């Protein structure tokens, strides 16, 4: 795995050097838009709706809207913002493990010890023994995150999972649920029996993404066979040459007599006959 961040966890007076790695990866089959008629890939260009010209990345800015008014900020403007130390994970507080609402949980990362393992093991064991998690602040890709730091797995691996800020979570507003019906004992009993019948230890490996499996099968069924062009006549000649036993060349005088040329048994062989012989033996 390739580290996405390197820094340290500040745990009181203890500094825990770590490297951060993405804990998840996607295995979805990637695709792109194409023209149905000829299979050509679809390309997009950034075009200004005011002047109609194509805009290069270096000329892009961001417009923010507040109370109906807009402000255009450039990369230089954003660079002036004060930023937190992007090499430190600051522990804010420790809370009981069950108090963090799962709806707040976002992207997970693994932390590996960088350098000495002792401070890493100390923090991991402390969290595990106390059955608590650490609420931390960390800056990733120039953006500050609130995150939870906890211990996972039999090797007590520190796992950091970013949290959504409270204002990013919507309140459920479902008036229909304000007046729930009374449930009978019989209904509750049957429902409880069904839960007991379907109860089992959670094993994610026994579940599979059926859509992904069927999509791959569909794609493979439409793959065009790759044709490898080859010179059939040339290949046949090479095969015949490989299996045909090589015959010894006949003596030039024997060959010449077989061809009807008149030459002496000991005299010099004319050059034109030598040339014909060599051409025939090539």
Curated annotation (Swiss-Prot):
Subunit structure: Homodimer. Interacts with host LigD, maybe via the LigD Pol domain.
Swiss-Prot/TrEMBL GO biological process terms: double-strand break repair via nonhomologous end joining; symbiont entry into host cell; symbiont-mediated evasion of DNA end degradation by host; symbiont-mediated suppression of host innate immune response; viral genome circularization
Gene3D superfamilies: 2.40.290.10, E3-binding domain (4.10.320.10)
A GO term for molecular function: double-stranded DNA binding
Residue intervals of the Ku domain: 9-189
Described function: Required for replication of viruses with short cos ends (4 bases). Stimulates dsDNA end-joining by host LigD; in conjunction with M.smegmatis or M.tuberculosis LigD can reconstitute NHEJ in S.cerevisiae. Binds dsDNA with either blunt, 5'- or 3-overhangs, protecting it from host exonuclease degradation.
InterPro entries named in the record: E3-bd_dom_sf, Ku70/Ku80_beta-barrel_dom, Lsr2_DNA-bd, Prok_Ku, SPOC-like_C_dom_sf
SUPFAM superfamilies hit by this protein: SPOC domain-like
Annotated SMART domains: Ku78
A Pfam entry, by short name: Ku
Keywords from the named record: DNA end degradation evasion by virus, DNA-binding, Host-virus interaction, Inhibition of host innate immune response by virus, Viral genome circularization, Viral immunoevasion, Virus entry into host cell
Protein name (Swiss-Prot/TrEMBL): Protein Ku
């Amino acid at each position: 795995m390739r580290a996405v961040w390197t820094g340290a966890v500040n745990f009181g007076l203890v500094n825990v050097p770590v490297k951060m790695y993405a804990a998840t990866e996607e295995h979805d089959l990637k695709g792109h838009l194409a023209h149905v008629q000829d299979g050509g890939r679809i390309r997009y260009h950034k075009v200004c709706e005011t002047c109609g010209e194509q805009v290069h990345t270096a000329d892009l800015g961001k417009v923010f809207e507040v109370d109906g008014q807009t402000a255009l900020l450039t990369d230089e403007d954003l660079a002036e913002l004060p930023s937190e130390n992007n090499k430190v994970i600051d522990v804010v507080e420790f809370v009981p493990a069950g108090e963090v609402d799962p709806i707040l949980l976002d992207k997970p990362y693994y932390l590996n010890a960088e350098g000495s393992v002792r401070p890493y093991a100390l923090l991991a064991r402390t969290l595990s023994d106390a059955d608590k998690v650490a609420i931390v602040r960390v800056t990733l890709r120039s953006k500050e995150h609130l995150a939870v730091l906890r211990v996972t797995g039999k090797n007590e691996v520190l796992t950091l999972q970013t949290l959504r800020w409270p204002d990013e979570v919507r309140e459920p507003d479902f008036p229909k649920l304000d007046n729930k019906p009374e449930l009978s004992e019989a209904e509750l009993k049957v429902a409880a029996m069904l839960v007991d019948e379907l109860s089992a230890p959670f094993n994610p490996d026994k579940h599979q993404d059926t859509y992904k499996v069927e999509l791959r099968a569909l794609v493979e069924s439409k793959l065009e066979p790759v044709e490898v062009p080859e010179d059939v006549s040339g290949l046949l000649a090479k095969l015949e040459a490989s299996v045909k036993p090589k015959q010894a060349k006949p003596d030039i005088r024997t060959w010449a007599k077989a061809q009807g040329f008149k030459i002496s048994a000991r005299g010099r062989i004319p050059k034109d006959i030598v040339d014909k012989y060599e051409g025939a033996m090539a």
